[in-house]
Amino acid sequence: MKRKYSLTLLGSAIVLALPLSTQAESILANDMYGDVEKAVKSGEVIEKVFATQNHIATVTGPNISVHNTTKVSQYAIQANRLATDNGPSKVIIGDPSTGIVNIKTDFGNAIQSNHSNIEVYGKKISVEGISTALRSYSNYDEGSNIIIGSDSTESVSLSSVSDVETDGYGIYAEGINSKVNVLGKTIKVSASKTGEAQGAYEGIDAINGARVSIGSQNTSSLSVDGSVGMYVGEADSSVSLRAKNINIDAVEVGVWTQKAAQVSILGEQTNISAPQGILAYSNSKVTIDSDLIVSSEEAAIVARGHSSVTINSRNAKSTVINGDIVFMSTSPDGKSGNVIDADVSVNLNNENSIWTGRSYQTFKNNSGEMIEVVDLDNGNDYYGNVTGFYLKASNGGTWNVTGDSFVNDIEVADGASINMHSDTDVLNVDGLVVNNASVNMQGGENQKVSVNKLAARSASLNMKASTKDGKSIQTGQFEVLESVEEGSDLGVTLTGITSDDIQDAQAAMDSVKNTVVVKGATIEKTIVEGDLRGEITETTAADGSRSIAKTAENTKLLSMKGVNAAALVAWRDEVAYTNQRMEFLRDNSHAYGAWAQVYGGESAYDDASVDLTTTTVQVGADATIGDWVAGAAFSYMSGDADMSNGQADTDAYTLSLYASRMFDSGLFVNGLARYGRLSTDATAGNMDGSYDNNAFSVGGNVGYRITFAEQAFVEPMFGLQYAYVTGDDYKASNGVKVEQDDFDALIASLGVRTGFDFAKDAGKLYARASVNHDFLGEVDGKASKGGLAESMYVDLGGTWFTYGVGTQFNITDNLSVWGNVDRTTGGEVSTRYMMNAGLRYVF
């Protein structure tokens, strides 16, 4: 008859289901049977394996299944040492080449070692117990050792179920020299309970000096779960977890240590999820070196009794803590465990590192009620004070303070921040170091930060504020009680209000002179700019002297003015490039025809840090009308503006009509009329605006050409141009209404061009310079909102200078090209460079 078998997935291991007709046997190694070695076949089930009296029981086979079904035995595998034995006994199950190993008991402990040794090897190992999956106990010098798996093991599952009669443990190790070592690529340790069970069910329990090591650098995944993830207590007990990914999921407590016990967690990512994440009591020690997430509804860390908790001390990992950090003692007077002090070190090392929670002390008062205290000196000599709480946030790390808190020492650096939520009233700190980082007080006038010792470099303090009358400001308080490091500086920004809310800047600053008490530091207070008014600042020197309050120009309006000014100047100065076409006509008789040129450059309005880069394409055609050459041109200009607080796009379409005449005497005249349509889209801070302008200009030049040395020439000239641009009204996205006045410009230019002709009429090289003056040039307007108004005035009038060099080549009788580079200096808007390249072809 052919037997049938089935495979059932249990956790991360494979459980072999055997036919009921298979007869199970027990393997016993003792003085009666001696050492026993059993080779089993696949499908064969062993009832139990037992070694005692210093003997060894060995089971080998391709797959191994041990299943205890009798309540009398209370174990599936046991190695035992009697008091009269000479040494420990030993059980060996499988070897690294064994496939599936299933060990299960319907009653008691699946694997139990009493002062002896048990080793289980295989590719996939599953251990199921009703009370305990693994139990190791020792009080002898030789110890008790359980080894489960090897680096070649693919998966290990250790599980137990607590019922109405027993507690449940995934791993239970007790006693000095009691050791458990579990290896595998994936490891799962779990403890659960039946619905009626009232006892404990803990993933790992190591007490009285036992040592448990789970995982290695080759372990990819390790999970522990139970009502308590792990409990480690008494007499230097220890648990070590190592894997790439570690998950501890508990109903009550994730990690619980006390009485000089130690826990070490080393990995790439560790998640602890439990109402109470980490408990460290009575000289115990918890060290975590891993990207860490602690999610706790009650407390992420609870410590007391000179214990220590160290999280990512090497500053190489990210840390996320959701929950409070608590220093607690529940011991009344006259009882042990009263010392509340402990060393807790939390490092928030990067922008992904965030602690959201509060920190406080809690203990029983004289009436026996638990109270919460956030004072550095809690006033209770019996419990003492906490002195070892250290927090470091750097490289963008964040502490979100959710309630009244204290910390002994805080270091905040390199873009990190402390954010005090609105429901936090008090933060007490003994030593605070702030280096290029910020403290954000979001709670208003009831919030207070008290610091004993401060060292601040490029430190920012943001304080939520309010005002009812625009003259008096209500905000919280930041004070240093003992000492300030020499050279400290602090920038204080009052948030929640803007300069638009202030009627009297000096009175407003006077009202907050005592809200930041940091004697010996340089303090600059700032009220941020609004939509219309600029920021308000006041400086307090280290000696306590105060400057007067200053109101700056609004940067958004300044940028909007700058973009408008730069765009107007760019269009105004385009006239020079159409005039250059007429220069070409003077230089080359019969050069009329179709032509095109491309020019572009960069101009700057330095008062607002506006840089405008433009590119223009211009095409035209001209012909003779008697002794005159007349023509028309069309151009399109595209511009991009970069601002310190935004950006803008400009476009201009321009139609030009021109005429030029060269007299035999060397006198020349030309005239130019233009119409343009200008469009601008600009964003500065929270201000987005779009507007259009119509632009007109008319002008002309007169000059005289003097030729000498046969090929050299000089051309003094004078020009006059009038421009008119219609204003536009628009409403920006922040509600500011801008009303532009019409713009007029009357520009006179006095200049000279000089150069020499190449031989055989091949072209020429020239330089030019001019002085220009705008007799009008005032750009005016108004920005208004909510009863406030600010001027949009810019004066583009005055004098500036233009200079440049150029060249021209006549390639054939019909084809010519030219190019030049120009600069302007001295005006409100300066042209850093303008480059032009042109082509003329006669058909």
Named regions from a protein language model:
Residues 647, 656, 660-661, 708, ...:
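Outer membrane beta-barrel transmembrane domains
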Residues 553-717, 822, 827:
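Outer membrane beta-barrel translocator domains of Type V secretion systems
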Residues 608-613, 640, 644-646, 679-692, ...:
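Solvent-exposed, glycine/polar-rich loop segments of beta-barrel outer-membrane systems
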Residues 435, 444, 457-481, 488-624, ...:
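Outer-membrane translocation/initiation segment of Type V secreted surface proteins
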Residues 25-54, 65, 69-84, 88-90, ...:
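Extracellular beta-strand/beta-solenoid scaffold signature
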Residues 308, 322, 327-510:
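Extracellular beta-strand/loop-rich repeat segments of large surface/secreted proteins
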Residues 29, 40, 384, 594-598, ...:
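Membrane-embedded beta-strand positions of outer-membrane beta-barrel proteins
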Residues 319, 353, 380, 590-594, ...:
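Outer-envelope beta-barrel architecture signal
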